[in-house]
Amino acid sequence: MTKKALSAVILAAGKGTRMYSDLPKVLHTIAGKPMVKHVIDTAHQLGAENIHLIYGHGGDVMRTHLANEQVNWVLQTEQLGTAHAVQQAAPFFKDNENIVVLYGDAPLITKETLEKLIDAKPENGIALLTVNLDNPTGYGRIIRENGNVVAIVEQKDANADQLNIKEVNTGVMVSDGASFKKWLARVGNNNAQGEYYLTDLIALANQDNCQVVAVQATDVMEVEGANNRLQLAALERYLQNKQASKLLLEGVMIYDPARFDLRGTLEHGKDVEIDVNVIIEGNVKLGDRVKIGAGCVLKNVVIGNDVEIKPYSVLEDSIVGEKAAIGPFSRLRPGAELAAETHVGNFVEIKKSTVGKGSKVNHLTYVGDSEIGSNCNIGAGVITCNYDGANKFKTIIGDDVFVGSDTQLVAPVKVANGATIGAGTTITRDVGENELVITRVAQRHIQGWQRPIKKK
């Protein structure tokens, strides 16, 4: 049977008062990504042709944060309940397409669970996602007859037998566009809150003799929402543990899964080791036998085989060749490219520069807008002076160059192959091949020197 086209509605208009934040609730992040972005991505994975994003509070902020998302922005000017929210998108529904209703503050719903829900949807009926809770207090109970859902009874309206039911409503549901439009038009607001509830569709479907089936989520965390920062932290830790468990099963040695954060994607080789408190952001690729020390932050980097990144190093938008050694306390800024067998040591910062094979930059050095050849030694305290207050300039260093400690290279400047620069030198002109350059003043010895005495 040919599958129906699919569109998604994501409810994301809530303010999130209990977050105590100026940021709309659904923009708070899980694993480095706004909660609603997780839901949008899942809808895309499902193959949704249209994603209708219902927004309200903080609309300008929402549009700014999600400017690149392929969604249909649907404004809910007043928040009058879940059915009212979906009503705002109903004019965009096609009669013969399936519509799945999702929630922007429930970010962990999976493609696999939603596929089961969509497959279970009866013709002209509703498929409802439910979950079994050990403590269902406060949730709407699922009432079944002959396996079908005939009602959702709220806590305050439930009798003693109904209160013992563990199966509860999640709010996630699927029906076709024509049915949604028909039932949404009939939803009333005759309740204490004066709001329009999506749960009323269950009773309306049963009135029309349309089947309502329930599919149970196997993991309660899939449907958990975050209304406050405590719940947000619980979702974060759950997802991080899930991601760490997957990596462990793939052969990555994560020394403490509870102290590992993946806020993007990680592609890895064999025998990778990751110590505690490491943060992975953006898209990171690690080769075979890479070792990441404690407290490192890696963002959008490619790391070759047999590289060791020692503790508390920060790498961003950089490339590191095989058998290199980085850190501890190194910083690679965007545009840093290190060839194979390079060494970058403690308190070294490299930005928008290339370092050739086998070269060493081991201590207390800044390299910016530079090209360093192979087999060079850059001493402690070397500075490439790349900025004149208005523009950046390049420093180009050839192969087999030795740069002594406390040297300043005032760009634009070139140092040819084999040159040696003495410690304490300031380079302002190009250096020729195999030259020795020293600019420091001659050392003087003054006998009988008397240091100044403090005045009392």
From Swiss-Prot:
It comes from the Bacteria. Its main location: cytoplasm. Binds 1 Mg(2+) ion per subunit. The gene is glmU. GO terms for cellular component: cytoplasm; membrane. GO terms for biological process: cell morphogenesis; cell wall organization; lipid A biosynthetic process; peptidoglycan biosynthetic process; regulation of cell shape; UDP-N-acetylglucosamine biosynthetic process. Pathway: Nucleotide-sugar biosynthesis; UDP-N-acetyl-alpha-D-glucosamine biosynthesis; N-acetyl-alpha-D-glucosamine 1-phosphate from alpha-D-glucosamine 6-phosphate (route II): step 2/2; Nucleotide-sugar biosynthesis; UDP-N-acetyl-alpha-D-glucosamine biosynthesis; UDP-N-acetyl-alpha-D-glucosamine from N-acetyl-alpha-D-glucosamine 1-phosphate: step 1/1; Bacterial outer membrane biogenesis; LPS lipid A biosynthesis. Residues 251-456 are annotated as: N-acetyltransferase. Catalyzes the last two sequential reactions in the de novo biosynthetic pathway for UDP-N-acetylglucosamine (UDP-GlcNAc). The C-terminal domain catalyzes the transfer of acetyl group from acetyl coenzyme A to glucosamine-1-phosphate (GlcN-1-P) to produce N-acetylglucosamine-1-phosphate (GlcNAc-1-P), which is converted into UDP-GlcNAc by the transfer of uridine 5-monophosphate (from uridine 5-triphosphate), a reaction catalyzed by the N-terminal domain. It comes from Haemophilus influenzae (strain PittEE). It is found in: Cytoplasm. This is Bifunctional protein GlmU. NCBIfam families: glmU, PRK09451.1. It catalyses: alpha-D-glucosamine 1-phosphate + acetyl-CoA = N-acetyl-alpha-D-glucosamine 1-phosphate + CoA + H(+); N-acetyl-alpha-D-glucosamine 1-phosphate + UTP + H(+) = UDP-N-acetyl-alpha-D-glucosamine + diphosphate. Its cofactor is Mg(2+). The lineage of its organism: Bacteria, Pseudomonadati, Pseudomonadota, Gammaproteobacteria, Pasteurellales. Keywords: Acyltransferase, Cell shape, Cell wall biogenesis/degradation, Cytoplasm, Magnesium, Metal-binding, Multifunctional enzyme, Nucleotidyltransferase, Peptidoglycan synthesis, Repeat, Transferase. Mg(2+) binds at residues 105, 227. Homotrimer. Residues 230-250 are annotated as: Linker. Acetyl-CoA binds at residues 380, 386-387, 405, 423, 440. UDP-N-acetyl-alpha-D-glucosamine binds at residues 11-14, 25, 76, 81-82, 103-105, 140, 154, 169, 227, 333, 351, 366, 377. Its EC number is 2.7.7.23, 2.3.1.157. GO terms for molecular function: glucosamine-1-phosphate N-acetyltransferase activity; magnesium ion binding; UDP-N-acetylglucosamine diphosphorylase activity. In the N-terminal section; belongs to the N-acetylglucosamine-1-phosphate uridyltransferase family. In the C-terminal section; belongs to the transferase hexapeptide repeat family. PANTHER family: BIFUNCTIONAL PROTEIN GLMU (PTHR43584:SF3), NUCLEOTIDYL TRANSFERASE (PTHR43584). Residues 1-229 are annotated as: Pyrophosphorylase. The active site is at residue 363.
